[in-house]
Each structure stands twice: as C-alpha cells, then as structure tokens.
UniProtKB/Swiss-Prot annotation:
This is Zinc metalloproteinase-disintegrin-like VLAIP-A. Its cofactor is Zn(2+). GO terms for cellular component: extracellular region; plasma membrane. Its EC number is 3.4.24.-.
C-alpha cells in the first residue's frame, strides 16, 4: 500500500447553511458554505517537481451536513493523448491546428475516504469545481466568487432551480441493435477463449469532440472557455466509464469558430447523419480516432438533448453522437454525452425493471434532477452482449505514444513517450517487470507486458501471438525483438471463402446467411431473390445509400447490396421477405460491405455490386 506524508495547510472549516444563492449552475435553493482544508498526499520519499503546478495526488477535508469528509484526488492521467491537438479556423477558412501543453493539467478524479461506492470528478484549476458521490447521493461543489476567500458552495443538483421546461430526453426511440434475445451474463454464456479474452481486456476509446459555431458564440468567442468546459466534461466521462474498464483519452478538440462544417439543424436525425458523414469524409482523414461527439447549443426539436447511433463503436460513419450543451452544470452535459456514447457501445434505454442503486441511471431515457453516474444492471449486460457479439477492435488498442493527448505522466496505465512501461501508481502496480515510481523496466527485464512478453522477457521468434480467426485470417508471430504482436495480417481481400459462398474482406468472410442469423436467430436464412427487388423502391424498406437524408434506390444490378432480406423460418411468421429496421439506426440491417452479390462480384463500400477485384 502506498505510504503518504500528510502536510496540513491550516485553513479552518466553517460550514454554513444557506437558503438561496446564484452560482454558475443557476439559482441554488439549499447549499452549504465550506472552506476546504488541503492535505497534500505524496508517496513516501517523493519530491514535487519545482516546475509542476498541480500535484499528482491531493486531499481535501471539509464537512457536509456536519459530518467530516475527506476527498482523495488523483490527477486524471488518462485525460489527454501525447499529441493532443486543437483545431480552429482563420477568418479566411484556413485550418489552424496546435498542440497546446497539457502535461501539468488540473483535472482530477477520486473518491471519498471510507466510502467504497463513492467517486469524484474535480477541476482544481481555480478552487474546487465538480461533483462527488457521497453515501449514494451526488453533490456539486464550486468556489464562491468572494475576494480573498477560500469559500466553496456544496449542494445537490436537485436544489438548483429549473427553468420551466420539459425534462430533456435522448432522441433514440428504438434501441435494439440486434435480435431481442434474452440477455445473459458472461457466466451463463458458452464463450470462446477469444471472446473471453476480449471481454476481460481493458478498452480505450480515443475521442474527438467538435464544438460548433453556436457554442463558439455562446462562450463569448473564447477558445479557452470552450476548452475548459470540454476538459471538465471529459474528466467526468472518465470517472463514469472507469467502472466498465473503459479509458477515454481525448485525442482532439475541434472548434468551428469560423462557421459550421455541416448544417447543424434542430432535427437530430438529420444532424447526426450529416455529422457522421463529415466525420468519415473529413475528420478521420485528418485525425485517426475511435469516436466523435458533436457538442452544440442549438435547441433540438422537442425536449431532445442528444442522439447517438446504437452498437456502432469503431464504425467510420456511425461511431458518433450529438449532444446539446443544454445546462450550465457541466455534470449534466457529461451525463448526456456518456448516455449517447453508451448507445454507441450497445446499450439501450433502461426499462422500469432496470436498477443501479440510485433513483436514475445513465441510460434512463430522460435526464433527471436525481441523475447518477451509475450504469444499470441492464446497461452492463447489454454492453457485455454487444462486446461479445461484435467485438469492436479499435477500442482494444491503447493510444499510441504519439496519440495520447497529454504528455507523459507516469502512473496512468498508458505507456507514453519516455516510458518503458506503466503499471499504475506504486499502490496499485502488481507488475514485477515495471518500476511504478519511474515507469522504467526493472533491472534485467526486457519488457513488462504485451502479447510477446513472458516473465519480463521477449517470447521466442515464431511464437504465435495472435491465432488465425477463421479462414480469412492468418496467425501473427512474435519477432523475438519486441513485446508487441505485429500488426494484424489477413488473407488478401477477394480470396474465396466459405466454400466459395463469399470473399475475404479485412480478415472476415461476410456472407448473407451469417448476417441473417445475427439479426434473426439461428434458424434464419437468406430470403428469395425476388425480395431484394424492394431495394429499388428508395424508402426505409429498400434502398442502397443515403444522400443528404434522401434514400437512393438501388440500380437493378445492385439490389443485393442494399437492405438485407431474410426469413426467420418461425412457424408464426409467414412473410418470406423480412428486414431488420430501426429508425434510430437505419444502417443496421443493410448488407455488409464485401459481401458476395454474384459470381465474381462483391458489394463495395458505396453499395454497388462490382467485380471482386475492384470492390475493395
């Protein structure tokens, strides 16, 4: 266990019960005034670097409802990637990308001492601002703007006066991303070794946030103000997702200060569609990442606060969400973004039987004044089911040393420039190959982790580190010179597979039969050819692609590259032409790119049935 030296700074703690006050969050009816007492916590023998403004670990003491509270904070070292970038635009439209220094940032997460279920997300840039959970209840804290005073207000969000408007909701109306099979826990599933390894591996979401022009105007045309707000939001996201073994690294922030790059409209489905296409066409070509979220201050139609594609993580167009900056309290905006990202990760809206130990959970369809940062049992199981079935690969990859937004910080579990390894804090590290205090290898060690590292030594050259996953994949071998398994290699695209029923595409063999089984269950088969003629209609039941929200009919030769038609073979169903359709994710149920659509032909990415040699 990490030993700490406690250096007390003498600041009295005088709780004061107030009746009403105007704070950044609005008019608060019930609050306490506290004077946090700082207790600096450093590992025994550690010395704070003179150029370091913000310590890696801090403690604060104050009282809530007359009871002492000890707030334990650690710098959120996963917040940024090493080459974190910010993009804005010059008056003549030129792209300006910078890499601001973010090594010594002031964003922390933590917990309350002696409260196992507690958590905290705090900005310590100018006093303490953020939230903490104490005994199952969520409190907000922010400094009072008084001269020469350390006074802070502590209050519950439910005590902030609300504007007279309908509660904000998520725009997703039907969230099933695949068949309505009963959800089972991992212990109930017959998982393959590959699925079990995938499920137990930590996940890393490399995130880019885009702030639109109306956000730029809302915050006084200040890039710094927008940056600060988004940093605080991502800090909260990290606390929320850490319980799922998911780490969120901010790779980039883009601000549309010279006008929007898409039409940001009140109609959420149109805006999300345009944003996803812009991400695939433009943003991904400039900045490789896993997920993008658009933050806007436009009023969406109705009480909608956001919208996200369901079960879409890692998809170049659909791994995206849009969120309204609907509240002064950044905690509430972070909850909305966590909710939409939850949809990207396969989670549906909570139903009445779902529970998280609080009055409202992350995936509730309505944002509540009693909102919590907890995922319900339903969300956890749906997320697990999505991971097992889809195994999105991009989130397995740690951010590269050259990708992580913040320069190297030892102890954040991310190996960054200048580090050999990173096993967490000295208190948490259990890796004998890595010195947790220095993030350097221990004497005699060649490596600390990786598929080609065994007991601190490189595995012998030729050792299989990634077995072939099917006939379109190949086994990858250790080189004997590195702890990392080489880049995943596949059979060439277009090679026949599955007894000539398909063609290899990016290591898989996409065939319609398997896609129907995934959507409708084990008894499903591909529908008769005549059903695919519906794809010439150009409506939700059949089309090939969308342009500016309009569904484009398939040309006669392309009908097998549009909507997938199946038959579930269940006795109660007589319709031989069945499709999977959900308005919130119309892409679900389309024929997968690379699927065979005729002899020597495969579906291209723009849903045309072309010669297999040109399809990829």
């Amino acid at each position: 266990m990490m030993q700490v030296l406690l250096v007390t700074i003498s600041l009295a703690v005088f709780p004061y019960q107030g009746s009403s006050i105007i704070l950044e969050s609005g008019n608060v009816n019930d609050y306490e005034v506290v004077y946090p007492q700082k207790v600096t916590a450093m590992p025994k023998g550690a010395v704070k670097q003179p150029e370091q403004k913000y310590e890696d670990a801090m403690q604060y003491e104050f009282k809530v409802k007359g009871e002492p509270v000890v707030l334990l904070l650690e710098k959120n070292k996963d917040l940024f990637s090493e080459d974190y970038s910010e993009t804005h635009y010059s008056p003549d439209g030129r792209e300006i990308t910078t890499n601001p220094p973010v090594e010594d940032h002031c964003y922390y997460h933590g917990r309350i001492q002696n409260d196992a279920d507690s958590s905290a997300s705090i900005s310590a840039c100018n006093g303490l601002k953020g939230h903490f959970m104490l005994q199952g209840e969520t409190y907000l804290i922010e400094p009072l703007k008084l001269p020469d005073s350390e006074a802070h207000a502590v209050y519950k969000y439910e005590n902030v006066e609300k504007e007279d408007e309908a509660p904000k909701m998520c725009g997703v109306t039907q969230t099933n991303w695949e068949s309505d099979e009963p959800i089972k826990k991992a212990s109930q599933l017959n998982l393959t070794p590959e699925q079990r390894r995938y499920l137990n591996s930590p996940k890393y979401i490399k995130l880019v946030i885009v702030a639109d022009y109306i956000m730029f105007l809302k915050y006084g045309r200040s890039l710094i103000t927008i940056r600060t707000r988004i940093y605080e939001i991502v800090n909260i996201l990290n606390v929320i997702y850490r319980v799922l073994n998911i780490y969120i690294a901010l790779l980039g922030l883009e601000i549309w200060n010279n006008g929007d790059k898409i039409n940001v409209l009140p109609e959420t489905k149109v805006t999300l569609d345009l944003f996803g296409k812009w991400r695939e066409r433009d943003l991904l070509n400039r900045r490789k990442h896993d997920n993008a979220q658009l933050l806007t201050d436009i009023n969406f139609n109705g009480p909608t606060a956001g919208l996200g594609y369901v079960g879409s993580m890692c998809d170049p167009q659909y791994s995206a969400g849009i969120v309204q900056d609907h509240n002064k309290v950044n905690f509430l905006v972070a909850l909305a973004m966590a909710h939409e990202m939850g949809h990207n990760l396969g989670m549906e809206h909570d139903e009445i039987h779902c529970t998280c130990g609080a009055k409202s959970c992350i995936m509730s369809g309505t944002l509540s004044c009693e909102a919590s940062i907890r995922f319900s049992n339903c969300s956890r199981e749906e997320h697990q089911k999505y991971l097992i079935n889809k195994m999105p690969q991009c989130i397995l990859n740690k951010p590269l040393k050259t990708d992580i937004v913040s320069p190297a910080v030892c102890g954040n579990y991310l190996v960054e420039l200048g580090e050999d390894c990173d096993c967490g804090s000295p208190r948490d590290c259990q890796n004998p190959c890595c010195n947790a205090a220095t993030c350097k290898l221990t004497p005699g060690s060649q490596c600390a982790d990786g598929e080609c590292c065994d007991q601190c030594k490189f595995r012998r050259a030729g050792t299989v580190c990634r077995p072939a996953n099917g006939e379109c994949d190949v086994s990858d071998l250790c080189t004997g010179q590195s702890a990392e398994c080489p880049t995943d290699q596949f059979q060439r695209n277009g090679q026949p597979c599955q007894n000539n029923n398909g063609y290899c595409y990016s290591g898989t063999c996409p065939i319609m039969g398997k896609q129907c089984i995934s959507l409708f269950g084990a008894s499903a088969t591909v529908a008769q050819d005549a059903c695919f003629q519906f794809n010439s209609l150009g409506n939700e039941y059949g089309y090939c692609r969308k342009e500016n929200g309009r569904k484009i009919p398939c040309a006669p030769q392309d009908v097998k590259c549009g909507r997938l038609y199946c038959f579930d073979n269940l006795p109660e169903h007589k319709n031989p032409c069945q499709i999977y359709y959900t308005p919130s994710d119309e892409n679900k149920g389309m024929v997968d790119p690379g699927t065979k659509c005729g002899d020597g032909k495969a579906c291209s990415s723009n849903r045309q049935c072309v010669d297999v040699n040109t399809a990829y």
